[in-house]
């Protein structure tokens, strides 16, 4: 277990960007984090970083700018994964997928208030992980297209002589 913990601590450092979908893992269980890293790499994703606590995750997000975040709900530190997700600046528009061993309604309701792009209840299959990431990225692209179209519409409306912008 010491080797896994040491390996996880070393991997908490920022990993330089590469081609592919950049996934950040927020998970405090070394075995789970290493399994996720292995599966994500096998699926062609790039693990941009691994954080074990909410405070560490928020700092790392600003450094690595991941395409998607896999966030365990129950992590070490002063804030859990739900609070951490709620503190990610909205302007970054980073999809968060919650990983949890908990499936009770109160936890899922609290998590849904942060508008996650998905949930995976542990244990989950690798194909479920891949499909959830794919759907989250597709939704993120659609959300970005909506934001761009809204901005274009706003500019068009503001250029009309009768508009008050």
Regions found by a protein language model. Give the residues of each.
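Helix N-cap/capping motif at the beta->alpha junctions
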Residues: 50-59, 80-81
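Conserved sequence signature across two-component system core domains
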Residues: 26-27, 51, 69
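Active-site beta3 strand of CheY-like receiver
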Residues: 64-71, 75
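PAS/LOV and related PAS-like sensory modules
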Residues: 2-19, 34-35, 110-113, 146-165
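Two-component/phosphorelay signaling modules centered on CheY-like receiver
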Residues: 21-22, 29-49
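C-terminal output helix
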Residues: 106, 120, 124-133
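Interdomain signal-transducing alpha-helical coiled-coil linkers
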Residues: 129, 135-150
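Alpha4 helix (beta4-alpha4-beta5 surface) of REC/receiver domains from two-component response regulators
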Residues: 79-83, 90, 97, 103-121
């Amino acid at each position: 277990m010491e080797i896994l913990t040491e390996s996880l601590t070393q991997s908490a450092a920022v990993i330089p960007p590469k081609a592919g979908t950049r996934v950040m893992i927020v998970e405090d269980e070394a075995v789970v984090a290493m399994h996720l890293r292995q599966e994500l790499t096998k699926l062609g994703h790039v693990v941009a970083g691994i954080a074990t606590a909410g405070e560490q995750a928020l700092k790392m997000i600003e450094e690595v700018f991941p395409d998607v975040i896999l966030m365990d709900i129950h992590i070490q530190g002063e804030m859990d994964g739900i609070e951490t997700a709620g503190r990610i600046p909205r302007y970054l528009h980073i999809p968060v997928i919650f990983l949890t061993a908990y499936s009770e309604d109160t936890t899922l309701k609290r998590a849904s208030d942060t508008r996650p792009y998905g949930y995976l209840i542990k244990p989950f299959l690798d194909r479920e992980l891949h499909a959830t990431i794919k759907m989250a990225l597709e939704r993120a692209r659609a959300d970005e297209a909506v934001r761009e179209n809204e901005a274009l519409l706003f500019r068009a409306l503001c250029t009309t002589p009768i508009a008050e912008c």
